[in-house]
A protein has these predicted regions:
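Short, charged amphipathic alpha-helical "coupling" segments at sensory-output junctions
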Residues: 386, 390-407, 504-511, 522
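Iron-sulfur-associated redox domains of electron-transfer enzymes in respiratory
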Residues: 58-351, 370-377
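Iron-sulfur cluster-binding cysteine motifs and their immediate structural context
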Residues: 3-8, 12-37, 41, 45-60, ...
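Signal-transducing coiled-coil/dimerization helices and immediately adjacent hinge/linker segments
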Residues: 510-560
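Sensory coupling linkers of modular signal transduction proteins
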Residues: 484-529
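PAS/PAS-like sensory domain cap-loop motif
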Residues: 428-440
């Protein structure tokens, strides 16, 4: 089931989503980014990073409306990060707004978090587990299940606050439907994976859009009830929030909080390598935990402001809540259909990328992958292609361009706006009898050519096409086109050596002139003769004169 969708028309092939995806679960095909669902951990980083808004979180507002329309009461479990998302709004105000949308009521997910905290405290008190990793974050759970299964024994088999609160609501209001609203994309997947507790998941962005659609404004109200002291678990959406809600009574355990996928991955590697002692680890995929979630409204006030809002809304006590018979949940290994290619295949791909030597592996990351070898593996797995390598494309384009420039029979010269030579090909150097490229590179063009035409093109903005010029200093005739590219601040000259053509034309003109001179003599001599025998030859002589005169005119025209 797709939780992240692509808006194909928006994707511009910038690879930013790959750069930000911690597990590289993105496949590029036909110039479009596609999520590889069985590899994705639903962290939402590609959604946040995409500058073109080409990634979309599945919208479930329609499903929530259907639940309301069914006539069965629908209760909302609202994530404690709502106070960071909706500035100055408490649970009472939000409850009023949600009722206007048709919900039966809204209660805090932090109530379910109370049961989760109690389960974590029991695990620590038992002391049977060397390492305990919190299991509230579904993205962290998925990361471990797919990529670090060796750490599964350390992952607490405890329901998340969302699942626990969904069950609490269904116990309090038998037969009701439940909708969770929070800042997290992966909660949609968790609700589907553990069906029964939560019937629908909305993000804060979805809720905000729905409220605007219905012209419902969330107005601050007096919230004395909402500020009850029984609310320590409202701290959950901040880094160390779980730890701050716990009684840390076992001195044998070290308590630590880790946020951000990369930090979590590093910690998991340390755990698997046996470098970690007895500890309880709170893990959150999002930097700053849930208040840094991908589906928080984009109008963030800043982490300090949001952290303060959560702290001020929280209390130091505990919720009085309904007890659940079973707080455990299964977190099995998730197998992925992913094959690792052999070293020979990787070397072959690197060779095709013009990286036959390790020194050629720049590891620049422009393709989105951290190393060239990682990119080669992705190509072999069908997730990437050669054209995603910027240095490769640049080298290929330059090679192609150089081949064209250096093998064309036309002379090509590129000047800066200061009329200094930036590039000149072999054909142009031959035209101007220049032995070495270094003799002219960076030099003023006035050293080799009259700059008047180049200055004219720059001042008028009008290009010159096929202008015939005699380069007296080189004894060459050229047909020159001069183009001024303002966007790149260059002047380009394309010269065609027409010296051979001019020499041939001069020979033809000379031959024509000689033929005309001979014709004139013939005509003159003929006319003297016809004066003597005009009466005998008559019309025939006149016709001869006309023919010769016409020949002369034709030759003259050819000369012109």
């Amino acid at each position: 089931m797709s939780y992240l969708r692509l808006k194909k028309s928006n994707c511009k092939n910038c690879y930013k989503c790959i750069r930000h995806c911690p597990v590289k679960s993105i496949r590029f095909s036909d110039g479009q980014a596609n999520i590889v669902e069985d590899e994705c951990i639903l962290c939402g980083m590609c959604f946040v990073a995409c500058p073109q808004n080409a990634k979309q979180i599945r919208n479930d507002v329609g499903k929530a409306k259907e639940l309301i329309a069914s006539g069965t009461p629908v209760y909302v479990s609202i994530a404690p990060s709502f106070v960071a998302n909706y500035d100055g709004i408490g649970i009472t105000a939000l409850n009023d707004a949600l009722k206007k949308l048709g919900f039966a009521g809204a209660e805090e997910t932090a109530e379910g978090a109370q049961l989760v905290t109690e389960q974590y405290e029991k695990l620590v008190a038992d002391g049977e587990h060397k390492i305990i990793i919190s299991s509230c974050c579904h993205t962290v759970n998925t990361l471990i299940q797919k990529y670090y299964p060796q750490a599964l024994p350390y992952l607490a088999q405890v329901k998340s606050p969302m699942l626990a609160h969904g069950e609490i609501l269904k116990k309090k209001y038998p037969g009701c439907h439940t909708v969770f609203i929070g800042p997290c994309l992966s909660k949609k997947a968790e609700a589907d994976a553990y069906a029964g507790a939560i019937d629908c998941v909305l993000t804060f962005e979805e809720l905000t859009g729905w409220l605007k659609e219905e012209n419902i404004e969330v107005c601050p109200v007096s919230d004395n009830a909402g500020r009850s002291d029984r609310a320590k678990t409202r701290l959950y959406p901040t880094t160390s929030g779980i730890l701050r809600s716990m009684n840390k009574d076992n001195p044998e355990y070290l308590y630590m909080a880790i946020d951000g996928v990369e930090n979590c991955r590093n910690a998991l590697r340390d755990i698997i390598d046996g470098n970690v002692g007895k500890c309880f680890i709170e893990m959150s995929a999002c930097v700053n935990s849930c208040i840094g979630g991908p589906a928080m409204d984009k109008k963030h006030e800043g982490v300090i402001h949001e952290r303060r809002a959560v702290d001020e809304f929280a209390g130091s006590g505990r919720f009085d809540t309904v007890e659940l018979a079973d707080m455990t949940k299964s977190l099995p290994f998730i197998s992925m259909q992913k094959t690792m290619p052999g070293s020979k295949a990787i070397e072959e791909i690197l060779r095709k990328m013009n990286k036959s030597d390790p020194s050629h592996e720049l590891n620049c990351g422009s393709c989105g992958y951290d190393t060239c070898r990682e990119k080669a593996v992705a190509i072999l797995q069908g997730k990437a292609d050669l054209t995603m390598c910027l240095p490769y494309l640049k080298e290929k384009a330059e090679s192609f361009s150089d081949n064209i420039i250096n093998n064309t029979p036309n002379g090509i010269m590129v000047l800066s706006e200061d009329l200094e030579v930036q590039q000149i090909n072999k054909a142009a150097r031959e035209i101007m009898n220049i032995k070495s490229l270094s003799d002219v590179m960076g030099c003023p063009v006035v050293r080799i050519l009259d700059p008047v035409s180049y200055l004219e093109v720059m001042s008028t903005g009008e290009n010159i096409h096929n202008k015939r010029t005699y380069l007296a200093e080189y004894g060459k005739y050229v047909e020159e086109t001069i183009i001024y590219d303002k966007s790149y601040h260059i002047i380009m000259s394309i010269m065609r050596d027409i010296t051979g053509e001019e020499i041939s034309r001069a020979k033809r003109e000379k031959n024509a002139a000689e033929t005309i001179a001979v014709t004139d003599k013939v005509i003159e001599k003929q006319m003297r003769v016809v004066q003597e025998i005009a009466s005998l030859l008559g019309e025939t002589t006149a016709e001869t004169k006309v023919a010769l005169t016409k020949l002369k005119e034709n030759l003259s025209n050819d000369e012109q």
